[in-house]
């Protein structure tokens, strides 16, 4: 370096020498001049070489006034180790020295002149301050100088960064080249070449920071002026990024000393876990600097934990130590967790401490809860909250993780964060939220007394390895088994000896230690278990394993309402267990010894839970649904594995391997409904052979032992309780508590025919009610009804397809299913089949394999929020008549139609035969049982048997679907009292039903593809040939085929072939589209008042009225969308189920109207005007079927629902009564009067 010349021209020169330009590495001759009256302000100049400077041959290449610099710092990058950087508002200028001594010499000289310049020009840059974090001496000098001038806070460091359009940079429009200026307490973003105000962030507001290659990021909390979020900055290279990271963390750590009491709220606010500034600071060395930033009082303790962690973090300097700063794993969790204030109060800290800095080795009981390797734990774990953070980079000490884990594991944020939950790999389980907050105070969070450790441990669900079986803890909490490694058996705690456990099962209790139970409440369990633990279990399970979350045992007897079984020791019984918590699903509870599942054989989960709208059967190879816990409304559904591991039969699995997400099947039982109406079931509270009344008091779930048990409909007052949950149960049907165990589904005699109850996932919940008309004896064989609304399981004829049970229920008793005898009024017939508890899929009656569910169930109006007009009425009459099934009417029952029972030709015809027989004109070739149509033909009524007015003994005649060619539609007038279209059956594929043309029947009349408004002999009294006058709204000409016409004629004459009886009633008119159109048909509910197409979500609440009013006007709309009549039917467009609007026309009802119905209709008319939505309350009042084959009908009650034949017609069996009432918005003339 050349010394400054003495000549006058160089009197102001303070330093000269050759330095390099960092980018080009070219040497230039630099001259540092002091301020002088002649020369001007202090400045740094450079010339191409010394010669030019001395000879003054040219002006300097560049001159930078020091007063314009707001900071001067030492720097280093990948190319130059010794840089001095000058930052101005507009640019960043750096010079590279060859050695550190040279760098320091220039730096000191620049600082001195810079501070003097600032003294004279206060407004220049805002203060240079500039000590580089690297040179303490300089830093001190720089700070002193800067503060002497007092122009503003000195910037300890300044970096030029490019803020990227990510996070807050984008939302706050902080994008472009900025200066990141660090002071002892703040970080500022100063826009380059702009007068915009700087964005100043308090170091305490920084949650965490980090760098990756040449990117550096800072995450700030809610207290920051910008709000919570991240700033991402790009710098020249990774060396600069690392330097920024280390320097800022150091500053945070330094500040932590001043703000050690930092408020918890802040630390919690640092939910993101990374660097709560205070945290980081204090562990700069060990903990990641970010942690250091947090100044927790607990810091000291957290330090103990963190320091090891920091080492784990990797670079000692790196701020990873602070778990949050690591951010790698814990980014999401709040930094506060780490050692943040969140960590309980200092005294709690002391408690920890006293426990030992051994925190790494917390008391055994605690450690037990923390079976993760210490290395895994992140320091953040120190605070219980931090628990989540522990999963972080694993920098934290084990002990920290452990403690917090057990206590408030579920809460990753500080208690103040209450809303913040983070689930760690370790299984802090969000679900445990309630328990985790036994008290918000940090103390409680941090560490409850060791005695409580067990309970706290149980607070967490142990996410145990798949292999481990779950045992019920005596306290009935969920026990999660960790991978089998290192589990210790806890001798005491009544685990092994619990009366509930059979001998070999008791042995399984040994696993108990490994599992963490979800404690229902913090204080629920006695401390005894915690002490029983064997020595350190902290290493019990490898953290790497995923653990299964499952309830420990089956719920005790139905009466318990999902609470712990009585035999459990009271000490372990949670005082206020939540239903899901109390529920013990484990097989151990099944004392009966029935089929104790072999836990070793538990199926491993394939990892996917099918969310398919259609059938989602459990894969055949999985007994239980593996590790998934069904998301049932009450959380009671447990993985199948738990419920009945061995009972899960592969046959139940859908060939497609989908798990059924049935809305209704998995409804959890009502808590109070536990009392089983069937005494036989209630006898076994714990579930001997699932003696537990899964039906929840409505339908006894009978084991094979109770083949004849019938669902005690009367137990509920004949009324199913509404399902308590508003949520659709998203669990495999088998898994839900309500769904009965597999044995319930299938008789032991035929295990291979064990289809899964497949339900379509519909937006609505479904309620399948017992058909009032069904004989109880027959009902229990008809099919297992899962009424989601009541959460109860109904046992009905097994002949019914499992999936069809839902739809058949909604349709009025499952008559749609392959359950030929279901509607029979001959109880003895049912008696013949006592062993039919197992359900047979409609599509696969002759096939052992499960076919896709044949129907969408329409039955449960549970979701309907509108008051039902008839609700009150039903309740009043429930004592006299079983409640009418409610049908939302929103979704079309879509039935694949395979294996539909043939129509009954006579009282006994095909009564017991589910075989399907299709006349050639109806069904060219027999369809395979499994049903090939991709979209379900909406085949709604084949199973339906109509009883006719003329005589109970008359054979039931059916008209096959008319060929599509016939376009004539009979539009019966509304005035026609009794003729009413039944359900529209849109059979898109070939019909499976066999039609028995035993007697001539009036053909179904079709109003434009609307479901047969069969004008077929609209009323018996009318002349057979008379055609009802078309309704005013009917758009298509009505033609009536004479009643005398043979069924075959009817088939050709009408598009919609519907089964019709001699009385002209069609159980279902059926749109038979040619098989090549496998499109879902769209049924539109015609709204004659305004023709507004009802959105599928709307619920119609129609006053019950005897079916004299029929929405024929609606028929036009149906025809329009449905494809018009005849050939139009070919054009059925696919519509999502949401677009289905159902017009249920019941031709049979058009015939004579009972006088009783008139007043009801009148009332209905008034209601129609007032109700925007009409909820069809379609429950039918059916008297129990008479044992005699005669179908004699007692006079129907005035409130008999729509669709039932009133007057002299014999009461229909439950099948006959349609679940949907015809909606008629126009009053018939007689009613209007």
Curated annotation (Swiss-Prot):
A motif (YXXM motif 6) lies at residues 727-730. Residues 891-893 are annotated as: GRB2-binding. Expressed in osteoblasts, but not in osteoclasts. InterPro entries: IRS, IRS_PTB, PH-like_dom_sf, PH_domain. Residues 257-425, 651-720, 766-985, 1015-1137, 1178-1233 are annotated as: Disordered. Residues 1116-1129 have a biased composition (Gly residues). Residues 264-276, 378-399, 407-419, 662-689, 785-794, 801-810, 1032-1042 have a biased composition (Low complexity). A motif (YXXM motif 1) lies at residues 460-463. Disruption phenotype: IRS1 deletion mice show impaired intrauterine growth, resistance to insulin and insulin-like growth factor-I/IGF1, and abnormal glucose tolerance. It is found in: Cytoplasm; Nucleus. The modification Phosphoserine is found at residues 3, 99, 265, 302, 307, 318, 325, 340, 343, 414, 522, 612, 632, 789, 887, 1096-1097. There is a cross-link at residue 1180 (Glycyl lysine isopeptide (Lys-Gly) (interchain with G-Cter in ubiquitin)). Residues 12-115 form the PH domain. Residues 155-259 form the IRS-type PTB domain. GO terms for molecular function: insulin receptor binding; insulin-like growth factor receptor binding; phosphatidylinositol 3-kinase activator activity; phosphatidylinositol 3-kinase binding; protein kinase binding; protein-macromolecule adaptor activity; SH2 domain binding; transmembrane receptor protein tyrosine kinase adaptor activity. A motif (YXXM motif 8) lies at residues 983-986. One of its GO terms (cellular component) is cytosol. Serine phosphorylation of IRS1 is a mechanism for insulin resistance. Ser-307 phosphorylation inhibits insulin action through disruption of IRS1 interaction with the insulin receptor. Phosphorylation of Tyr-891 is required for GRB2-binding. Phosphorylated by ALK. Phosphorylated at Ser-265, Ser-302, Ser-632 and Ser-1097 by RPS6KB1; phosphorylation induces accelerated degradation of IRS1. Phosphorylated on tyrosine residues in response to insulin. In skeletal muscles, dephosphorylated on Tyr-608 by TNS2 under anabolic conditions; dephosphorylation results in the proteasomal degradation of IRS1. Ubiquitinated by the Cul7-RING(FBXW8) complex in a mTOR-dependent manner, leading to its degradation: the Cul7-RING(FBXW8) complex recognizes and binds IRS1 previously phosphorylated by S6 kinase (RPS6KB1 or RPS6KB2). Ubiquitinated by TRAF4 through 'Lys-29' linkage; this ubiquitination regulates the interaction of IRS1 with IGFR and IRS1 tyrosine phosphorylation upon IGF1 stimulation. A motif (YXXM motif 2) lies at residues 546-549. A motif (YXXM motif 7) lies at residues 935-938. Pfam families: IRS (PF02174), PH (PF00169). It comes from the Eukaryota. The modification Phosphotyrosine is found at residues 460, 608, 628, 658, 891, 935, 983, 1173, 1220. Interacts (via phosphorylated YXXM motifs) with PIK3R1. Interacts with ROCK1. Interacts with GRB2. Interacts with SOCS7. Interacts (via IRS-type PTB domain) with IGF1R and INSR (via the tyrosine-phosphorylated NPXY motif). Interacts with UBTF and PIK3CA. Interacts (via PH domain) with PHIP. Interacts with FER. Interacts with ALK. Interacts with EIF2AK2/PKR. Interacts with GKAP1. Interacts with DGKZ in the absence of insulin; insulin stimulation decreases this interaction. Found in a ternary complex with DGKZ and PIP5K1A in the absence of insulin stimulation. Signaling adapter protein that participates in the signal transduction from two prominent receptor tyrosine kinases, insulin receptor/INSR and insulin-like growth factor I receptor/IGF1R. Plays therefore an important role in development, growth, glucose homeostasis as well as lipid metabolism. Upon phosphorylation by the insulin receptor, functions as a signaling scaffold that propagates insulin action through binding to SH2 domain-containing proteins including the p85 regulatory subunit of PI3K, NCK1, NCK2, GRB2 or SHP2. This is Insulin receptor substrate 1. It comes from Mus musculus. The gene is Irs1.
């Amino acid at each position: 370096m050349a010394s400054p010349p003495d000549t006058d021209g160089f009197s102001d020169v303070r330093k000269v020498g050759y330095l390099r330009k960092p980018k080009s590495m070219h040497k230039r001759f630099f001259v540092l001049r002091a301020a002088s009256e002649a020369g001007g302000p202090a400045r740094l100049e450079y010339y191409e070489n010394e010669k030019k400077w001395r000879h003054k041959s040219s002006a300097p290449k560049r001159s930078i006034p020091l007063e314009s610099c707001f900071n001067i710092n030492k720097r280093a990058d990948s190319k130059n180790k010794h840089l001095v950087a000058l930052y101005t508002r507009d640019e960043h200028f750096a010079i590279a020295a060859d050695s550190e001594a040279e760098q320091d010499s220039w730096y000191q000289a620049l600082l001195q002149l810079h501070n003097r310049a600032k003294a004279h020009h206060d407004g220049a840059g805002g203060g240079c301050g500039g000590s580089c974090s690297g040179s303490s001496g300089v830093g001190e000098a720089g700070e002193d100088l800067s503060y002497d001038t007092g122009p503003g806070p000195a910037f300890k460091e300044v970096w030029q960064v490019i803020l990227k359009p990510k996070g807050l940079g984008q939302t706050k429009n902080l994008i472009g080249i900025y200066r990141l200026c660090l002071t002892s307490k703040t970080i500022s973003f100063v826009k380059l070449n702009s007068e915009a105000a700087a964005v100043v962030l308090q170091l305490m507001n920084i949650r965490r920071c980090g760098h990756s290659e040449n990117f550096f990021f800072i995450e700030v909390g809610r207290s920051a002026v910008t709000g919570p979020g991240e700033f991402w900055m790009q710098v020249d290279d990774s060396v600069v990024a690392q330097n920024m990271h280390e320097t800022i963390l150091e500053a945070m750590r330094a500040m932590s000393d001043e703000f050690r009491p930092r408020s918890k709220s802040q630390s919690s606010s640092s939910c993101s876990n990374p660097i709560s500034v205070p945290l980081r600071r204090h562990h700069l060395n060990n903990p990641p600097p970010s942690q250091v930033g947090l100044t927790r009082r607990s810091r000291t303790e957290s330090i103990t934990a963190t320091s090891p962690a920091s080492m784990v973090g990797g670079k000692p300097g790196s701020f990873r130590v602070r778990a949050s700063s690591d951010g790698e794993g814990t980014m999401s969790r709040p930094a506060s967790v780490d050692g943040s204030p969140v960590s309980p109060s200092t005294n709690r800290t002391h408690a920890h401490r006293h426990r030992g800095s051994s925190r790494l080795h917390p008391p055994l009981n605690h450690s037990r809860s923390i079976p993760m390797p210490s290395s895994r734990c992140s320091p953040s774990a120190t605070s219980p909250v931090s628990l989540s953070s522990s999963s972080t980079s694993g920098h934290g000490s084990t002990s920290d993780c452990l403690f917090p884990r057990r206590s408030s594991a579920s809460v990753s944020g500080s208690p103040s964060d209450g809303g913040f939950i983070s689930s760690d790999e370790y299984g802090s389980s969000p679900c445990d939220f309630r328990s985790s907050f036994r008290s918000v105070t940090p103390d409680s969070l941090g560490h409850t007394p060791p005695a409580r450790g067990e309970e706290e441990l149980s607070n967490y669900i142990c996410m145990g390895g798949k292999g481990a079986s779950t045992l019920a803890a005596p306290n009935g909490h969920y026990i999660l088994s960790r991978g089998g490694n290192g589990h210790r058996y806890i001798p005491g705690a009544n685990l092994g000896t619990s009366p509930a456990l059979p001998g070999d099962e008791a042995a399984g209790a040994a696993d108990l230690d490994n599992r963490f139970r979800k404690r229902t409440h913090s204080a629920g369990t006695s401390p005894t278990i915690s002490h029983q633990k064997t020595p350190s279990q902290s290493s019990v399970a490898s953290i790497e394993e995923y653990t299964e979350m499952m309830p420990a045992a089956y719920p005790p007897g139905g009466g318990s309402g999902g609470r712990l079984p009585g035999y459990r020791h009271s000490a372990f019984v949670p005082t206020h267990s939540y239903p899901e918590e109390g529920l013990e699903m484990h097989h151990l509870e099944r004392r009966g010894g029935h089929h104790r599942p072999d836990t070793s054989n538990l199926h491993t989960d394939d990892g996917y839970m099918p969310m398919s709208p259609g059938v989602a059967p459990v894969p055949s190879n999985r007994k239980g649904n593996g590790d998934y816990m069904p998301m049932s409304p009450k959380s009671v559904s447990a993985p199948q594995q738990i419920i009945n591991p061995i009972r899960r039969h592969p046959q139940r699995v859908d060939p497609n391997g989908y798990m059924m997400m049935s809305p209704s099947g998995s409804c959890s039982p009502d808590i109070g409904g536990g009392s089983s109406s069937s005494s036989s079931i209630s006898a076994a509270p714990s579930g001997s052979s699932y003696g537990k009344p899964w039906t929840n008091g409505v339908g006894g779930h009978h084991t094979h032992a109770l083949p004849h048990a019938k669902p005690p409909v009367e137990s509920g007052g004949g009324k199913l309780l509404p399902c308590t949950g508003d949520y659709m149960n998203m669990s495999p049907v088998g898994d839900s508590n309500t769904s009965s165990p597999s044995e319930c589904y299938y008789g032991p005699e035929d295990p291979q025919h064990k289809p899964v109850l497949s339900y379509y996932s519909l937006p609505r919940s479904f309620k399948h009610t017992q058909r009032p008309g069904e004989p109880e004896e027959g009902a229990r064989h008809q099919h297992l009804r899962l009424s989601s609304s009541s959460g109860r399981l109904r046992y009905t004829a097994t002949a019914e397809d499992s999936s069809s049970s839902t739809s058949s229920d909604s349709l009025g008793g499952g008559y749609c299913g392959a359950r030929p005898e279901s509607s029979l009024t001959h109880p003895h017939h049912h008696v013949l089949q006592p062993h039919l508890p197992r359900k047979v899929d409609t599509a696969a009656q002759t096939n052992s394999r499960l076919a896709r569910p044949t129907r969408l169930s329409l039955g449960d109006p549970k979701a309907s929020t509108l008051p039902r007009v008839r609700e009150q009425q039903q309740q009043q009459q429930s004592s006299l008549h079983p409640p009418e099934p409610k049908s939302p009417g929103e979704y079309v029952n879509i039935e694949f139609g395979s294996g539909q029972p043939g129509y009954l030709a006579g009282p006994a015809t095909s009564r017991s035969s589910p075989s399907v027989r299709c006349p050639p004109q109806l069904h060219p070739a027999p369809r395979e049982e499994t049903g090939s149509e991709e979209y379900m033909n909406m085949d709604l009524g084949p199973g339906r048997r109509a009883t006719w007015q003329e005589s109970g003994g008359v054979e039931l005649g059916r008209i096959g679907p008319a060929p599509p060619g016939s376009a004539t539609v009979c539009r019966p007038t509304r005035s026609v009292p009794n003729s009413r279209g039944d359900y529209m059956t849109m059979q898109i594929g070939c019909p499976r039903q066999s039609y028995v043309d035993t007697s001539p029947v009036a053909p179904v009349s079709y109003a434009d593809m609307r479901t047969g408004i069969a004008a077929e002999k609209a009323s018996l009294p009318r002349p057979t040939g008379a055609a009802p006058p078309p309704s005013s709204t009917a758009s298509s000409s009505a033609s009536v085929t004479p009643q005398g016409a043979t069924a075959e004629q009817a088939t050709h004459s009408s598009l919609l072939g519907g089964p019709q009886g001699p009385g002209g009633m069609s159980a279902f008119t059926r749109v038979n589209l040619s098989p090549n159109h496998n499109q879902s048909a769209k049924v539109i509910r015609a709204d004659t008042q305004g023709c507004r197409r009802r959105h599928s979500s709307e619920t119609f609440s129609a006053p019950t009225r005897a079916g004299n009013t029929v929405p024929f006007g609606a028929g036009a709309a149906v025809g329009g969308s449905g494809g018009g009549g005849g050939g139009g039917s070919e054009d059925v467009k696919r519509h999502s189920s949401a677009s289905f609007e159902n017009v249920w026309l019941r031709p049979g009802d058009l015939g004579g109207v009972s006088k009783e119905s008139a007043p009801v209709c009148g009332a209905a008319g008034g209601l129609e005007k007032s109700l925007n939505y009409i909820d069809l309350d379609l429950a039918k009042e059916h008297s129990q079927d008479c044992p005699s084959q005669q179908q004699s009908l007692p006079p129907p009650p005035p409130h008999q629902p729509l669709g039932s034949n009133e007057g002299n017609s014999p009461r229909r069996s439950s099948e006959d009564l349609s679940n949907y009432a015809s909606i008629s918005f126009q009053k018939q003339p007689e009613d209007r009067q």
